[in-house]
Structures are given as structure tokens and as C-alpha cells.
């Protein structure tokens, strides 16, 4: 809630820190993020609305044009599409591998590889993958 139009203008002008709009800043989400960070011993946390958003944010934070990702072949279709199509258009290449074959994973790693992505219970096949 804004006290007056000057207060609203200051918030939207970013000269006064605080909540502006629920999609940009949200006091409930802020409390959750701070508590998760404290529980995990971290500096900060980010809560997003879906697993797909979390995956996209993480990969885009780690990789940029010219970089590479190694990913499990049997992953959720939306994630496969992100890696195979969306990120390819941004210049991030992905090699899909059988993560149960460690040699195949190792062979896929390149100098530009920024992450190895796997799902411990890969959708749609429900194959269990141990990250160890």
C-alpha cells in the first residue's frame, strides 16, 4: 500500500526500496526466501513458481552463448525442449547422454561444459538415477 502518489512514484522509481507489485516483489515470497536461505546457511534464496522456472533460471545463470550442457536423455519433455530448442537459439549447446553409462557422460564433457543435468527420477520413463 502506498501512502500517497509521491510514495508510489518513489517506489516505482526505485529510490525507495519496498514492495511495488506482486509479480516483482512480494512480501510473502521474501519471507520464504530469507527463511530457506537461513535454513540452508546461504546468503540468499530464490523461490519460483515451478520446477521448469527453477531449471531455466539455474541453467541461464550458469551458461551463456558458446557454453555447453551435458544432460540425461530421459528427462521431462519441457526440460528437453528448453535444452534442445530454446537454449540452442541462445547459443547454449546440449549433449544428451545415458547417465547410467559413466564413460558416456565423461566423454560428453567439453571445456565449455558448465553443468551436467539429470533428474533423479526422470520423467516420463521414471528411471531412477543416482547422482553418486
Q: Each PLM stretch: what is its role?
A:
Residues 39-42, 63-68, 88, 114-115:
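Short, surface-exposed connector motifs at secondary-structure boundaries
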Residues 4-56, 78-85:
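Conserved N-terminal alpha-helix of the aminotransferase class I/II PLP-enzyme fold
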Residues 61-79, 97-98:
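Conserved PLP-anchoring active-site segment centered on the Schiff-base-forming lysine
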Residues 128-132:
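Conserved small/polar residues in nucleotide/adenosyl-binding loops
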Residues 81-126:
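PLP-dependent aminotransferase-class I/II
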Residues 35, 58, 104-108:
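CheY-like receiver
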Residues 21-22, 47-48, 72-73, 94-97, ...:
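Glycine- and other small-residue-rich loops at beta-strand/loop junctions that grip anionic moieties
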Residues 36, 54, 69, 116-119:
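Buried hydrophobic positions in well-ordered alpha/beta secondary-structure cores of metabolic enzymes
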